[in-house]
Every structure is written in structure tokens, then in C-alpha cells.
């Protein structure tokens, strides 16, 4: 899980979701998991 100031989709399967006021990226590729921190 990458935690950074800016998150973006890396591939076509990445999905941007807002959870508890945070923007997270979930993907079938675990390397693409990100959270805005």
C-alpha cells in the first residue's frame, strides 16, 4: 500500500473509492493499492 499526497489510477482495473473521507485506490494488482494520507 502506497500512502501519498496524490493518488491516481495506474492501470485500467484501478478503482478510486472514497472511504471514511480518504481516497483509496483498489486494484486486482496488489502493487497498485494506494491511499491518500
From Swiss-Prot:
One annotated Gene Ontology cellular component of this protein: ribonucleoprotein complex
Keyword field: Chloroplast, Plastid, Ribonucleoprotein, Ribosomal protein
Main location: plastid
GO molecular function list: structural constituent of ribosome
Keyword Plastid included in the entry's annotation: yes
GO BP of this protein: translation
Pfam families attached to this UniProt entry: Ribosomal_L36
Keyword Ribosomal protein on entry: yes
Places the protein is found: Plastid, Chloroplast
Superkingdom in the source lineage: Eukaryota
PANTHER family assigned to the protein according to its UniProt record, in alphabetical order: 50S RIBOSOMAL PROTEIN L36, CHLOROPLASTIC, LARGE RIBOSOMAL SUBUNIT PROTEIN BL36C
Family listed: Belongs to the bacterial ribosomal protein bL36 family.
Protein name: Large ribosomal subunit protein bL36c
The species this protein was found in: Lotus japonicus (Lotus corniculatus var. japonicus)
Gene name as annotated: rpl36
Amino acid at each position: 500500500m502506497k500512502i501519498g499526497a496524490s493518488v491516481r489510477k495506474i492501470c485500467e482495473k484501478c478503482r478510486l473509492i472514497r472511504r471514511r473521507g480518504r481516497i483509496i485506490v483498489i486494484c486486482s494488482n496488489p502493487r497498485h493499492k494506494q491511499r491518500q494520507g
